[in-house]
Amino acid sequence: MIIVISGPPGSGKSTVAKILSKNLSLKYISAGHIFRELAEKEGLSLLELNKKAEENFEIDKKIDREIFRIASTEKNIIIESHIGGWLLKDIADITVYLNASIEIRAMRIAKRDNIPFTKAIEQIIEREESHSRRFLAYYGIDLSDLSVFDLVINTDNLQPDEISKIIEAYLNFMLAKNIH
């Protein structure tokens, strides 16, 4: 079973993927974690590495190759990745897109990173613009095209455990119908 969770920053990808990993006994893989490790190793902030990645496609390719390798060789995993749904749509059993309003996402990020709300908004806008430019230029991926996803969930008014229950119910429905 390969489940891919995608979505913009602050949508709840990591939190929900970790809950599902535990509930379904799946190995948790985070593209964001790999990206953050690279930023730390390079002595850069996430925004700085995003800007560097706009100039150097190899940064994204390296991370995406590693995620693709893992998805191609391991089973029983859940992958959390901004663009995983697009890149892994032919490998994944189920692709899920989580979204939330920019205000809710900024509140979550401000709380998580202990930064002012306005700074969180600025970071979200910068990261999303960087992602949109890079992924369209490098892969031809339009981040507004959600047609590749099996399930799209607005997380504004839902708790992480509620979101995971929705995904688990969908998964059980699809398995019962033998569709994936």
UniProtKB/Swiss-Prot annotation:
Annotated catalysed reactions: CMP + ATP = CDP + ADP; dCMP + ATP = dCDP + ADP
Annotated Gene Ontology cellular component terms: cytoplasm
GO terms of biological process kind: pyrimidine nucleotide metabolic process
Domain of life where this protein originates: Archaea
Family, as annotated: Belongs to the cytidylate kinase family. Type 2 subfamily.
NCBIfam families linked to this entry: cyt_kin_arch
Protein name: Cytidylate kinase
